[in-house]
Structures are given as C-alpha cells and as structure tokens.
Design a protein with these regions (language model features):
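Anionic-ligand binding patches
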Residues: 2-12, 16-200
C-alpha cells in the first residue's frame, strides 16, 4: 500500500475547468499536478467511447511522468441531435475549444433540426468517464451519467464548457448558475468520482 500523504497525482487534462473540478474532488493529501507542469500536450483521442478515451489519456500521462494519473473524458449528448456531440463535444469549439462557439453551434443545429425546439423539452445527458492509471496493476474506471435538458438560452457564468445550457433533471438552474457545492450534488463528474474514491 502506498503512502498517501504528499503523494503526487497528475490530472490528465489540459482543460483548466476539468483540472479545477477534479482537484476539488480529490483528497487533500494529494499533491495535484497537470500535464502543463511537465510541458506535455494531450494525446490523440481516437477511442470510440468515453471510457476508451479516458484510458488513453490516463495511460499516456502516467507513462510519461511515472506518476499516478486520473483522467476524465466527458461530453454532452442531445437526443434531438442523435446524441451529438458525445465524445466529440469539445471539438465543436474548434482548435481552441471555444465553448461559446460550441454553444452557438448547438443552438444553430437545434434550430436547423426543429425551428420550434425552444417550445419543447430537449432531453440531454452529461456523461463522464474517469480512469485512474498507475495506482493498481489494472486501470480503475467509472462512468457517471446525469440526465437533464437543454436550456432555451445560455444562463450563468459559473462552471465551464456546456454548463450554462444544461439543466439537470428535476432542477430549475443550469450548471452555469450553480455553486460548486450544489453542482457536485447533481454532477456527472462527481457521480463518477464517488464510484472510485475508495481507491484513493
């Protein structure tokens, strides 16, 4: 059993929003680092599922740094768009992962499919896959799914990514309006983390 105190773990992402959320979920005795601390860029994500892409990142950064790595792959699926964007969610923001651009594209696409979409309940879900690599002989993985709907407009400036347009099931606020404490009670990433925190 490794000594947990002052143990380094690398969060396998170059997305500042993800790094912050995962850091806040991890036990406080870890020293948290990121690929930027090692001058590493993200690997090519060519998996066809969230779990596969999460594993690709966790394995890559763990091998490169010789450290334990926890990596996230997540995305938004929208029923009306045939579950797009799914694993390609971040790519809708272009090379710079501009989520303002991505959100604009979501609304444009919804209007193209159904010009009256704002009068309907557009079902969607956030999915998060987490992988811990380098802690055990085999990777540790989990999946968190939160159902909800797409808001009629962008609301809130908290969180990151698609948070301002996603309203979780049985709630009235978007993730972009929620405090971090409230979001973690309804969040796909926190849900996935709960399944693997016992290993940490």
């Amino acid at each position: 059993m490794f000594k947990k105190k002052n143990k380094e773990i690398i969060v396998g992402s170059n997305n500042d929003g993800k790094i912050k959320e995962i850091k806040d979920l991890l036990p406080k005795y870890y020293i948290i680092t990121s690929p930027k601390d090692y001058g590493l860029k993200s690997p090519k994500e060519n998996g066809d599922t969230f779990l596969k892409n999460s594993l690709i990142k966790a394995k890559y950064f763990s091998k490169k740094t010789k450290k334990i790595c926890i990596a996230d792959d997540s995305g938004l699926e929208i029923d009306l768009l045939n579950n797009q964007h799914g694993i390609y969610s971040a790519r809708w923001g272009g090379n710079k992962s501009d989520f303002n651009l991505a959100i604009s594209r979501v609304y444009k696409k919804l209007s193209q499919v159904d010009k009256n979409w704002k009068s309907k309940n557009i079902k969607a879900r956030f999915i998060c896959a987490l992988t811990i690599y380098g802690l055990k002989k085999k990777p540790i993985q989990s999946l968190g799914i939160i159902n909800g709907r797409i808001s009629k407009k962008k609301i809130g400036n908290k969180g990151f990514g698609y948070d301002p347009i996603f309203i979780p099931e049985n709630k009235k606020l978007t993730f972009g309006q929620m405090s971090q404490k409230l979001k973690f009670k309804n969040d796909h990433r926190a849900k996935a983390f709960k399944k693997i925190k016992k290993f940490l």
